[in-house]
């Protein structure tokens, strides 16, 4: 998960989003009352976290984990998302997987993704930051329920508008 640890990576980047720190008030204000799709839902932890703020109208994952449809996020179309205002997910962090996902998701709906904060400083992510309209800082998160430790990396919610282009000024919201 982290570049500063030597732990083995979990298959398919399955890191459940159960930590309430992943949903700061500034993020909740952005999504309150909206209907959304969670296309990398895993066991539904993020949907549970957002239950009081927004309404999940589509849940799916590429692997059956007891929640939502068994469905590849890269196969989503506007048809599956017709009842959704936006996409919210904690996607896999493998670059060759997530970068095409960003392109695909923003071609369908406005999108919020929980990603490592330092990605915004990397060249490979530059074209995505050029299109990113908002970044909300989250800080360090806990990925393992039985562990007393949080991650060694910081995280952010990144927002892209529907069909975002590279003429966007990014608004940054720190931890308040």
Each predicted region: which residue ranges?
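Class I S-adenosyl-L-methionine-dependent methyltransferase catalytic core
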Residues: 1-176
């Amino acid at each position: 998960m982290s570049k500063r640890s030597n732990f083995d990576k979990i298959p398919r980047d399955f890191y459940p989003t159960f930590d309430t720190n992943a949903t700061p008030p500034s993020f909740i204000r952005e999504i309150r009352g909206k209907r959304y799709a969670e296309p990398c839902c895993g066991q539904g932890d993020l949907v549970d976290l957002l239950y009081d703020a927004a309404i999940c109208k589509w849940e799916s994952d590429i692997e059956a984990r007891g929640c939502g449809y068994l469905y590849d996020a890269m196969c989503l179309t506007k048809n599956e998302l017709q009842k959704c205002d936006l996409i919210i997910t904690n996607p896999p962090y493998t670059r060759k997987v997530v970068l095409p996902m960003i392109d695909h998701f923003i071609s369908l709906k406005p999108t919020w993704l929980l990603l490592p904060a330092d990605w915004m400083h990397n060249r490979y992510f530059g074209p995505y930051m050029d299109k990113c309209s908002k970044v909300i800082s989250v800080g360090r998160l806990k990925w393992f329920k039985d562990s007393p430790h949080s991650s060694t990396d910081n995280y952010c919610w990144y927002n892209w508008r529907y069909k975002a282009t590279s003429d966007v000024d990014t608004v940054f919201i720190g931890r308040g």
